[in-house]
A protein has these predicted regions:
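Conserved alpha/beta catalytic core and glycan-binding cleft of carbohydrate-active enzymes
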Residues: 128, 144, 149-307
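Substrate-binding/active-site clefts of carbohydrate-active enzymes
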Residues: 2-128, 136-163, 167, 179-180, ...
Length: 307
């Protein structure tokens, strides 16, 4: 509703109504016609088949906000149960938004902590998923004053819960609020997306090549690449080690791999934000032409870079 009021329609499935049900639209048509029970059975069957194929299932979970529009809009989620306990608010009752989605779940309260833990236990034990990737996880570690705390009770409780002992926990270690970038700050036992690794890999394989073509030399060199490949020890403590870093190059946010090799700048012109949304710092290189092209040498260079 927060997005639809702005005239936007594509929310990527990240405006959660509740924390305990699969999104029915992702199920087969047959399961949808069969109702919620059929959707749930199909999800369980999917997990079972993936396990039989030797694949673990990591569930992307959004506990940092819900689909509530705001105080002036209809009640769609936790506000109808306990608005004060479940949402971060200013003294006058306005929602504190450190997520960019209109509200933030107040994980400083025991009620919100219990709800999230119950949800994790349900997905891990009843539905047998193997791990979780936590969207905007820095929000989950904010205290009553909205400050991030590495030893936040919820972050520790997730690790200490005996029902979640063997479950993988992966943090997207930032949000859009003040002090939101917390890479390397989560407790031992958490893995974190390493955006420094992402950017350095893009530089080495893309922007350095572009700079070398234009200027005859690459600005970054191999030293910082080696540091990232060795585990980003300058970011993650010795106690946590390199396994705390989840290295990646692209994700659902921002440029795809194809975009990285085809655009020097973002062109988000079709979603009503006038190209303001998304970062301008994409560490990309178009290989000589901005956007799609049929030139064979450029197409070949882009494919090689993606590989």
């Amino acid at each position: 509703l927060f997005r639809s009021k702005q005239g936007l329609t594509n929310y990527w499935g990240y405006n959660t109504l509740n924390f305990f049900t699969p999104h029915a639209a992702y199920a087969t048509r047959e399961a949808q016609f069969g109702g919620t029970g059929a959707v749930l059975r199909e999800f369980k069957g999917m997990v079972k088949l993936l396990h039989e194929a030797g694949l673990e299932v990591i569930l992307d979970v959004v506990y940092n906000h819900t689909a509530e529009e705001g105080l002036g809009g209809p009640t769609t989620s936790l506000r109808g149960i306990d608005n004060k306990n479940y949402y971060r608010q200013t003294p006058d009752g306005a929602y504190v938004d450190v997520t960019g989605c209109g509200n933030s779940v107040n994980t400083a309260t025991p009620a919100a902590q219990r709800l999230i833990l119950d949800s994790l236990r349900y997905w891990a034990n009843d539905l047998q998923v193997d791990g979780f990737r936590f969207d905007l996880a820095a929000t989950l570690g904010r205290d009553a004053a909205n400050e991030f705390q590495p030893e936040h009770p919820l972050l520790l409780a997730i690790l200490d819960d005996p029902q979640l002992e063997s479950v993988t926990m992966i943090a997207e270690p930032w949000d859009v609020g003040m002090g939101g970038w917390q890479v390397g700050k989560f407790p031992d036992g958490w893995s974190e997306w390493n955006d420094g690794y992402r950017d350095r890999m893009r530089d080495f394989w893309l922007t350095d090549i572009g700079a070398a073509r234009a200027n005859g030399s690459a600005p970054n060199g191999i030293g910082s690449l080696a540091r990232r490949l060795a585990g980003s020890a300058h970011v993650f403590s010795q106690e946590r080690g390199p396994m705390a870093s989840l290295n990646f190059v692209t994700a659902h946010d921002g440029f795809t791999m194809a975009d990285l090799t085809a655009y020097n700048s973002k062109h988000n012109l079709g979603n009503g934000e006038n190209n303001r949304d998304g970062t301008d710092n994409n560490h990309s290189f178009n290989h000589g032409v901005e956007g799609p092209t049929t030139k064979k040498d450029i197409v070949d260079s882009r494919r090689k870079a993606m590989r």
